[in-house]
């Protein structure tokens, strides 16, 4: 397994939107590639989102996990738990025959019921209308679990499901797992615990 791509976003850097259609961004190390980690030092009690992709024999996986140095403020912990709950909602609906846009709509509706409609998958004009994407020979490929997608989910599809919530000026929380769609429950291809890791 090789690391293909990834970024580490800590504190307020995690709330900086991307120039790409993605819920995560970051300042980056240079204006030549304004994405990902910055030179800012990681501080205690702030969210540290590690979003990384692996590659093995030409196939990719995608995963995000949340860390902190010491405890996080309670509202960020609740936001992270909301992302885990949204991931579970997506997995409940990720079945052969489901319409990709309906899977997204149910995830967005749950985010709204939990109080995160304006921060789910980023904020303002940077807010994206998807909660997952296909992954395989490319890191981002069809199907997209996105608003407006008429694509029908089929067994054998591999997707990265990535609910994220942005806290402006403070950071980003969330999870991401790569799963295989089966005729039953989706099979996790990423297996590390999804809970916040306090260092």
Regions found by a protein language model. Give the residues of each.
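Active-site neighborhoods and metal-handling regions in enzymes and metal-associated proteins
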Residues: 1-199
């Amino acid at each position: 397994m090789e690391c293909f791509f990834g970024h580490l976003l800590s504190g307020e850097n995690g709330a900086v939107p991307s120039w790409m259609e993605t819920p995560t961004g970051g300042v980056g190390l240079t204006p030549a590639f304004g994405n990902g980690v910055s030179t800012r030092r990681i501080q205690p009690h702030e969210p540290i989102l590690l979003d990384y992709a692996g590659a093995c024999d030409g196939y990719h996986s995608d995963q995000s996990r949340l860390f902190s140095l010491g405890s996080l403020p309670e509202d960020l912990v609740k936001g992270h738990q909301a992302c885990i709950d949204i991931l579970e909602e997506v997995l409940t609906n990720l079945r052969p025959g489901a319409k990709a846009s309906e899977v997204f709509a149910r995830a967005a509706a749950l985010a709204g019921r939990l109080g995160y409609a304006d921060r789910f998958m980023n904020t303002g004009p940077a807010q994206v209308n998807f909660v997952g994407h296909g992954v395989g020979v490319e890191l981002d490929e069809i199907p997209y679990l996105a608003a407006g997608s008429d694509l029908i989910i089929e067994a054998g599809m591999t997707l990265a499901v990535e609910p994220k919530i942005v806290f402006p000026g403070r950071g980003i929380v969330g999870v991401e797992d790569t799963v295989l769609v089966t005729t039953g429950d989706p099979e996790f291809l990423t297996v590390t615990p999804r809970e916040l890791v306090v260092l």
